[in-house]
Structures are given as C-alpha cells and as structure tokens.
Amino acid sequence: MNPSAAVVLCLVLLSLSGTQGIPLARTVRCTCIDFHEQPLRPRAIGKLEIIPASLSCPHVEIIATMKKNNEKRCLNPESEAIKSLLKAVSQRRSKRAP
C-alpha cells in the first residue's frame, strides 16, 4: 500500500472515531413553556420550587403549586411581582428560622 494512502486512511478513521459520541442536535427540556401572568397571593401558594438553569434548560424556572387545587403554575422570574414575592417568602422564612 502506498504510504500516503495509508496516512490518509488513518486520518479518516481517526476523524470518524472522534465524532462518534458528539450529539447532532441538543434538545431543550424545560418544565415551563408558558408563564402565568396574573398576580398570585402568597398565602394561596402551597409550595414554591426554584429550578436553576442547567444544561437541559438554559433559564431559571419558578413553579408555584397552589394550596387549593394542587395546580402547578410557572412564574416569570423576570417579573417585578415575582421578584417581590420571592423576597417576601425569603423574609418570612428567615423570621421562622431560630
């Protein structure tokens, strides 16, 4: 076999093996697709989840579970109303902690 052909063949094989594990398309898997825009009363919220940005979802997600019907609502983390709600919840928790 020609030495230059052997080198080309080796380079082709090496390049093919290097791309084997690279995903072709990255899927985004966020829990929240749409945001609840109406204001919420803090007392109506049973549980508040804050999911930080990750590789699977590039933005912060805030999910409120309502006390009355266990409905989950996605909240807009950029909204001023939600920022003040998070601040109020944080202050309430700090008062409870000994």
Swiss-Prot record:
Where it sits in the cell: the answer is: Secreted
Which domain of life does this protein belong to? Eukaryota
Cited SUPFAM superfamilies: Interleukin 8-like chemokines (SSF54117)
Q: Which Pfam families match?
A: IL8
Q: Which GO terms describe its molecular function?
A: chemoattractant activity; chemokine activity; CXCR chemokine receptor binding; CXCR3 chemokine receptor binding; cytokine activity; heparin binding
Q: Which SMART domains is this protein grouped with?
A: SCY (SM00199)
**Cystines in this chain:** 30-57, 32-74
- Biological process according to GO: adenylate cyclase-activating G protein-coupled receptor signaling pathway; antiviral innate immune response; cellular response to heat; cellular response to interleukin-17; cellular response to lipopolysaccharide; cellular response to virus; chemokine-mediated signaling pathway; chemotaxis
Q: Does the keyword Disulfide bond apply?
A: yes
- Gene Ontology CC, one term: extracellular space
Identify the stretch annotated as signal peptide in this record.
1-21
**Stored PROSITE patterns:** SMALL_CYTOKINES_CXC
The chain residues annotated with the modification Citrulline are: 26
Tissue spec = In the central nervous system, CXCL10 is predominantly localized to activated neurons. Expressed in both microglia and astrocytes.
Which UniProt keywords are present, listed alphabetically? Chemotaxis, Citrullination, Cytokine, Disulfide bond, Inflammatory response, Secreted, Signal
Assembly and oligomerization: Monomer, dimer, and tetramer. Interacts with CXCR3 (via N-terminus).
Which function does this protein serve?
Pro-inflammatory cytokine that is involved in a wide variety of processes such as chemotaxis, differentiation, and activation of peripheral immune cells, regulation of cell growth, apoptosis and modulation of angiostatic effects. Plays thereby an important role during viral infections by stimulating the activation and migration of immune cells to the infected sites.
Q: Which family does the similarity line name?
A: Belongs to the intercrine alpha (chemokine CxC) family.
Q: What is this protein called?
A: C-X-C motif chemokine 10
